[in-house]
UniProtKB/Swiss-Prot annotation:
Function: Lysozymes have primarily a bacteriolytic function; those in tissues and body fluids are associated with the monocyte-macrophage system and enhance the activity of immunoagents. Has bacteriolytic activity against M.luteus.
Enzyme category, top tier: hydrolase
Disulfide bonds: 24-145, 48-133, 82-98, 94-112
Organism: Gallus gallus
Name used for this protein in its record: Lysozyme C
InterPro entries per UniProt: Glyco_hydro_22 (IPR001916), Glyco_hydro_22_CS (IPR019799), Glyco_hydro_22_lys (IPR000974), Lysozyme-like_dom_sf (IPR023346)
Highest taxon in the source lineage: Eukaryota
GO biological process: cell wall macromolecule catabolic process; defense response to bacterium; defense response to Gram-negative bacterium; defense response to Gram-positive bacterium; killing of cells of another organism
Membrane spanning residue stretches: none
Something else known: Lysozyme C is capable of both hydrolysis and transglycosylation; it also shows a slight esterase activity. It acts rapidly on both peptide-substituted and unsubstituted peptidoglycan, and slowly on chitin oligosaccharides.
Binding site for substrate: 119
Keywords: Allergen, Antimicrobial, Bacteriolytic enzyme, Disulfide bond, Glycosidase, Hydrolase, Secreted, Signal
SUPFAM superfamilies recorded: Lysozyme-like
Any one GO molecular-function label of the UniProt entry: lysozyme activity
Length: 147
């Protein structure tokens, strides 16, 4: 029993770090956070963007050629939206550390995404959305989900 407790305590911090969501699980979480029809974008748009940006992985990171990094389930960029402490000239318009975007709790990612989508370019700010989701049947991404 004691060794089981030690094992659980060792892995507990890992559970808080990040998560790979299921499609419907993410759709439900995004809906709870108010993304369904936010700025006119249906929930399917957001789920599609997350699929092609991060494969539903909150811990996804990708380094860009300009030295910035994209973080989290929606691949939010450190040049403009968050501070990672290593991107020169970071604007940090969401006023958050980039590490907050890697959590299994998607609140910081959703709140920042709401600022991004309100910034004038809408979801065109996400290259993967523009290339893989825009103009497609994005409702397919939430079809069969109990929302």
């Amino acid at each position: 029993m004691r060794s089981l407790l030690i094992l659980v305590l060792c892995f507990l911090p890992l559970a808080a770090l990040g998560k790979v969501f299921g499609r419907c699980e993410l759709a439900a979480a995004m809906k709870r956070h108010g993304l369904d029809n936010y700025r006119g974008y249906s929930l399917g748009n957001w789920v599609c963007a997350a699929k092609f940006e991060s494969n539903f992985n909150t811990q996804a990171t990708n380094r860009n050629t300009d030295g910035s990094t994209d973080y989290g389930i929606l691949q939010i960029n450190s040049r403009w939206w968050c501070n990672d402490g290593r991107t020169p000239g970071s604007r940090n318009l969401c006023n958050i550390p980039c590490s907050a975007l890697l959590s299994s709790d998607i609140t910081a990612s959703v709140n920042c995404a709401k600022k991004i989508v309100s910034d004038g370019n809408g979801m065109n700010a996400w290259v993967a959305w523009r290339n893989r989701c825009k103009g497609t049947d994005v409702q397919a991404w939430i079809r069969g989900c109990r929302l």
